[in-house]
C-alpha cells in the first residue's frame, strides 16, 4: 500500500506527496502529459528532443546538473509515446535545490541557438547509433507504421525520420514548450522523509508564481480496427533472421489490458513459458523468444519477437508459433499455471514498490490515468483474473487478422 496526499495549486499543478521516514533520500518526480503521440506527423521527435533540451539550462540557471550534483543529487528523464518524465534524487535536507531547478526550467527554459544546436546534434547521433547503425536497430521504425495506420503510435519516440530533428527551428521548439510544459500539464510527486505541510509550503514557494496555462486538448486520430493480416520482410546485415509478431491490444485503462499482460507472461516471460518451452527447448526453432506488451495508454501492442536458429525457415517457425497461440485460444489454462502467473506478477509488483523512485513515478502515472490510488488497486486487478477471462481475451487478440508481422532477413557478408 502506497500512502499519499494530493493537492493542486491555483495555476493547475497537481501535486502528490508520499511520506517515507525510512530513507535519507528524497525524490522529486515531474511527469509532463506529453509524448510522441502529441507531435505533428510532419515534425516528429520533438518530445524526445525536448527531454534533452530541458537539461540545457534555464534563464536563471545556465547549468542544470552542477547545482544538483553539489547537493549530492542526480537526475535523469525518459520519453515515451505517451509521457515525458523527469526525476531527481537527492538527500532530503537539500530538496529545495531540486524544487528550485525544476520550477525554474518549467517557468523559463533557456532557448539559445547554442543549446538547440548542441542537443539537436546529441539526438541526431543517438538516432544514428541506436536506430540506423545498430543491428536490428530500425525494427521499431519499420514495425510501428506496419501495425498503426492512423494513430500517432505509428512513429517511434526518436522520430519518424532524422530530417525532422535536423530541420527543427527555434520557433518550433518554443511553440512545443508553450503548449506542453506548464503547470496544468504536469504532475509533481515529492517522496521521502518530509511532512505533508512542509511539502505544501515548499511547492507553493517554488511553483506558486508560475503562470497558469490551458491544458492542451488532445484530439488524436482513432486507429481503425485491423481486419487483415499484415506482413513485411526487410533485409539487413544482421547475425540472424529475426521475427516480430505484433497484435493490437486494449488500452491502458481497460481491465483487458491487465489480462493481456498476463497472457504475454504465459507466452514468453520466462524459460517455463509456452513459446520458450515449445519453440526453443523442444523444437529448437529459435535461439531466443520473448513476449511482452508496449504498455501504451491508448491501444497498444502485444509483441512476440525472437531470432531463428540456423537452417530454420520463417515458414517452419510460423506454423509452430500459431499452434502455440491456438492452444491458448482454445484450451482453458490449468489452475496451476494460472496461479503461478498471478503469484509471479504479485512478486514483481511488490518488488517494484520497494524503491522510492518507482513509487513516485507510479503515483504520477496513475494520477495521469485518472487516480493515483490506482497503483494500490493494480495488484487486486491482476489477482482477480481468471483462466476463462484469459481464454476470452486471447481469442479476441491472438488471431491472424489482428497481427502485423515483421521479418528481418539476414544478409550474409
Predicted regions located by residue number:
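M16/insulysin-pitrilysin zinc metalloprotease superfamily fold
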Residues: 57, 89-122, 290, 294-352
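M16/MPP (pitrilysin/insulinase) zinc-metallopeptidase core fold and M16-derived inactive scaffolds
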Residues: 27-89, 155-158, 269-285
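Buried hydrophobic packing residues in well-ordered domains
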Residues: 12, 30, 48, 86, ...
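His/Glu-based metal-binding/catalytic segments typifying zinc-dependent metallopeptidases
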Residues: 20, 29-31, 145, 215-274, ...
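An aromatic/glycine/proline-enriched structural segment found at the starts
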Residues: 2-5, 149-150, 154, 182-251, ...
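Histidine-acidic residue clusters that define the catalytic metal-binding segment
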Residues: 1-6, 145-186, 218-223, 349, ...
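A structural supersecondary motif
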Residues: 165, 244-248, 267-308
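C-terminal regions of mature proteins
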Residues: 187-192, 328-332, 336-413
Amino acid at each position: 500500500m502506497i500512502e499519499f496526499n494530493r493537492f493542486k495549486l491555483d495555476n493547475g499543478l497537481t501535486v502528490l506527496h508520499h511520506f517515507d521516514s525510512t530513507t535519507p533520500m528524497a525524490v522529486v518526480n515531474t511527469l509532463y502529459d506529453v509524448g510522441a503521440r502529441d507531435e505533428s506527423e510532419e515534425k516528429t521527435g520533438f518530445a524526445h528532443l525536448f527531454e534533452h533540451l530541458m537539461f540545457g539550462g534555464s534563464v536563471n540557471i545556465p547549468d542544470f546538473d552542477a547545482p544538483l550534483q553539489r547537493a549530492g543529487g542526480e537526475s535523469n528523464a525518459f520519453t515515451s509515446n505517451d509521457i515525458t518524465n523527469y526525476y531527481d534524487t537527492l538527500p532530503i535536507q537539500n530538496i529545495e535545490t531540486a524544487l528550485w531547478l525544476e520550477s525554474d526550467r518549467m517557468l523559463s527554459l533557456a532557448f539559445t541557438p547554442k543549446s538547440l544546436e548542441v542537443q539537436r546534434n546529441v539526438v541526431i547521433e543517438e538516432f544514428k547509433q541506436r536506430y540506423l547503425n545498430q543491428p536490428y536497430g530500425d525494427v521499431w521504425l519499420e514495425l510501428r507504421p506496419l501495425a498503426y495506420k492512423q494513430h500517432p503510435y505509428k512513429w517511434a519516440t526518436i522520430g519518424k525520420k532524422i530530417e525532422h530533428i535536423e530541420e527543427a527551428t527555434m520557433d518550433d521548439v518554443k511553440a512545443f514548450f508553450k503548449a506542453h510544459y506548464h503547470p496544468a500539464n504536469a504532475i509533481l510527486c515529492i517522496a521521502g522523509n518530509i511532512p505533508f505541510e512542509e511539502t505544501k509550503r515548499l511547492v507553493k514557494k517554488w511553483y506558486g508564481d508560475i503562470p497558469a496555462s490551458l491544458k492542451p486538448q488532445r484530439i488524436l486520430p482513432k486507429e481503425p480496427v485491423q481486419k487483415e493480416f499484415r506482413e513485411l520482410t526487410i533485409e539487413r546485415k544482421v547475425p540472424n533472421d529475426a521475427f516480430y509478431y505484433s497484435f493490437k491490444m486494449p488500452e491502458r485503462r481497460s481491465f483487458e489490458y491487465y489480462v493481456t499482460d498476463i497472457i504475454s507472461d504465459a507466452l514468453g516471460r520466462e524459460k517455463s513459458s509456452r513459446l520458450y518451452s515449445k519453440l526453443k527447448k523442444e523444437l529448437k526453432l529459435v535461439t531466443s523468444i520473448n513476449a511482452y506488451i508496449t504498455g501504451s495508454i491508448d491501444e497498444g501492442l502485444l509483441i512476440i519477437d525472437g531470432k531463428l536458429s540456423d537452417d530454420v525457415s520463417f515458414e517452419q517457425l510460423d506454423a509452430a508459433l500459431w499452434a502455440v497461440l491456438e492452444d491458448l485460444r482454445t484450451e482453458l489454462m490449468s489452475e496451476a499455471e494460472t496461479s503461478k502467473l498471478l503469484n509471479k506478477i504479485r512478486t514483481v509488483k511488490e518488488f517494484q514498490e520497494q524503491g522510492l523512485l518507482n513509487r513516485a513515478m507510479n503515483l504520477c502515472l496513475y494520477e495521469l490515468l485518472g487516480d493515483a490510488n490506482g497503483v494500490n488497486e493494480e495488484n487486486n486487478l491482476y489477482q482477480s483474473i481468471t483462466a476463462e477471462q484469459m481464454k476470452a481475451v486471447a481469442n479476441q487478440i491472438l488471431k491472424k487478422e489482428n497481427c502485423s508481422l515483421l521479418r528481418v532477413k539476414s544478409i550474409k557478408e
